[in-house]
Amino acid sequence: MWTVQNRESLGLLSFPVMIAMVCCAHSANEPSNMSYVKETVDRLLKGYDIRLRPDFGGPPVDVGMRIDVASIDMVSEVNMDYTLTMYFQQSWKDKRLSYSGIPLNLTLDNRVADQLWVPDTYFLNDKKSFVHGVTVKNRMIRLHPDGTVLYGLRITTTAACMMDLRRYPLDEQNCTLEIESYGYTTDDIEFYWNGGEGAVTGVNKIELPQFSIVDYKMVSKKVEFTTGAYPRLSLSFRLKRNIGYFILQTYMPSTLITILSWVSFWINYDASAARVALGITTVLTMTTISTHLRETLPKIPYVKAIDIYLMGCFVFVFLALLEYAFVNYIFFGKGPQKKGAGKQDQSANEKNKLEMNKVQVDAHGNILLSTLEIRNETSGSEVLTGVGDPKTTMYSYDSASIQYRKPMSSREGYGRALDRHGAHSKGRIRRRASQLKVKIPDLTDVNSIDKWSRMFFPITFSLFNVVYWLYYVH
């Protein structure tokens, strides 16, 4: 009951106040009051000197800043800048513009701003800025009875943003907007964020195609120059790059091209046209991807994260092409050389056999034999007669490599038999060794090279990806 009575009493008290406000607003539009407002504005501007700041010679003027971010239009890695559109508001108190008799704020034409003192605010890292002028110049001037001036502008500025692209495109960037007084030092003017944490609005509504705004920070500080100390406000945006675009446009194509280059390991090694065409195509494709990426980035002296990945993919693709070059050399290079060497050895053996079969007879009727070394120990073929027979005769006459048969003792015949047995033993050992060599895999076999490549390339490329993503993501 008591609550209902309080509400009724409050309603009765507020009703006269509302009537008074309506009457004042209505009276301001009356011709007599319009002339009074005109006289008030004329009186404020009469004798006003825009060359002097408010309270000249006294304490510094406190200028409050508010920013309503409309959009971040572009972030350029090539130019190292970003474009920002905002509603920029400044407020300060100028006692020369205080008035009485009109309990209303006076919103004046934007051209009146040219007749009033305004702070010499500028953007320190600005490259190009302009105030919008459609349909009229987008600026506002509003006066309060206590002399407070509200000055608003709609500005689009392109500000420098120095980026560290070592982790590109897995990077985060900090882009700032530096607001500073150009001529007035801290003895004449002070800047502050009007509204504290609420001085900057509209950031949460912004959506960028390649970035996400993780956080923003407002800073107020003083900077020292040779001409004095100046006030500075900083608005810093923390931008995190979205990786989805680069996965679809760069990482995935590079990975697929690298895997495609391994198809040559399953193609027959004598299909030179197919394997060479595939290898060259993959190498040129990787080169095209790298070239296109470099065109969209500045020419910086350090290596970026995406450069390391593309370089790794290019190395794997190039090694796949070199692998076939090695296989081709083994199969088509050494093969004919070995075959030619084998034919030369065979012809030399046949020539030696013909020379061994030649029989010469001297004038006395003796058989002449040239001194030849035993070429084949496994054959055991020797010119032996009457082994163990003491009557067997072989005469020897050493002159110009001529041998005559002379009688051979039983001891010499026994030694010949032992030599023949040793030759047979050596032949068996060599045949056994050749059988063992067949069981050992030949490292120059082209099929084994392709088989090892089918396992080596995917495993090493997978390890490369694991190390790369663990390092740059974390």
Swiss-Prot record:
Name this polypeptide is given: Gamma-aminobutyric acid receptor subunit beta-1
Positions of transmembrane segments: 246-267, 271-293, 305-327, 452-473
Extracellular side: 26-245
This protein's domain notes: GABAARs subunits share a common topological structure: a peptide sequence made up of a long extracellular N-terminal, four transmembrane domains, intracellular or cytoplasmic domain located between the third and the fourth transmembrane domains.
Record-linked SUPFAM superfamilies: Neurotransmitter-gated ion-channel transmembrane pore (SSF90112), Nicotinic receptor ligand binding domain-like (SSF63712)
Entry function: Beta subunit of the heteropentameric ligand-gated chloride channel gated by gamma-aminobutyric acid (GABA), a major inhibitory neurotransmitter in the brain. GABA-gated chloride channels, also named GABA(A) receptors (GABAAR), consist of five subunits arranged around a central pore and contain GABA active binding site(s) located at the alpha and beta subunit interface(s). When activated by GABA, GABAARs selectively allow the flow of chloride anions across the cell membrane down their electrochemical gradient.
A cellular component term, taken from the record's GO annotations: plasma membrane
Reactions accelerated catalytically: chloride(in) = chloride(out)
Signal peptide: 1-25
Residues carrying covalently attached carbohydrate according to the record: N33, N105, N174
